[in-house]
Amino acid sequence: ERFPGVPRRLQVVYRGDFTILDDFGHNEASLRAVFQTITGMDYRRLVIVNYLKGTRGIEANEITARHIVRAARKARLARVISTRSDSHVSRKNIVQDEEEEAFTAIIAGAGIPIVNTRELPAAISLGLESVGPGDLLLLLGPSGMDAGADLALRLLHQPPREKQLLPPALLASG
């Protein structure tokens, strides 16, 4: 039986004139894997839409920003769009001003163009407007980005992602 992959773990959600890749980016190992994978892909430029990690402290957002900066040149990074996803997260995941500021300071300090948004739909729209033929759009971040791929697909007039279930053999082994 073919394993469909794990949703939001280096998931290709759209392939057309450009590609959309979605990843939860939940820890440093995950971020390393994302950027290592991306640098091996064939694309023209990279645009990242990143959900800031709300109520996880400044350090969590600084870690993500540092991984982005380290990968920027090799990954041909064109711009970063960050979002608080205010209307798409629970109270416990609300991004604090200092979390956004910490992330932004590192990205901007490296000379990478960055735009901050409060809402996920605005960030996704801006991400789609920022890509061209051959580009890669990376949707990155935990729960506040969960709806990101489906929003992008809707804006591209594409059907939503199929809900992926784990194969029965994996469920039985747990």
Predicted features by range, described:
Residues 2-174:
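ATP-dependent carboxylate-amine ligase
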